[in-house]
Amino acid sequence: MKLCVTFLLILVILPSVTGEKSSKRTLSGAALRGDWGMCSGIGQGCGQDSNCCGDMCCYGQICAMTFAACGP
């Protein structure tokens, strides 16, 4: 348990010691903005198949239900 806590502390402190700047696109930032894990429903906008919920596909930038698998 102590080893785990020590490892996590090192991961948190190491970037500040090396002078590495943090990214604005972090997991906590995504959670605060509310866009973490969101998907588009039927008729909603999308950019690719992975933006649509479930087995829906992105056709013409709109999520739609299909009988066949999503295309390439």
From Swiss-Prot:
Keywords assigned: Cleavage on pair of basic residues, Disulfide bond, Ion channel impairing toxin, Neurotoxin, Secreted, Signal, Toxin
Disulfide bonds: 39-53, 46-58, 52-63, 57-70
Main location: secreted
Keyword field contains Nucleotide-binding: no
Signal peptide stretch: 1-19
Tissue: Expressed by the venom duct.
Protein name: Conotoxin Ep11.1
Record text about domains: The cysteine framework is XI (C-C-CC-CC-C-C).
GO cellular component terms attached to this protein's record: extracellular region
Protein family membership: Belongs to the conotoxin I1 superfamily.
Subcellular compartments: Secreted
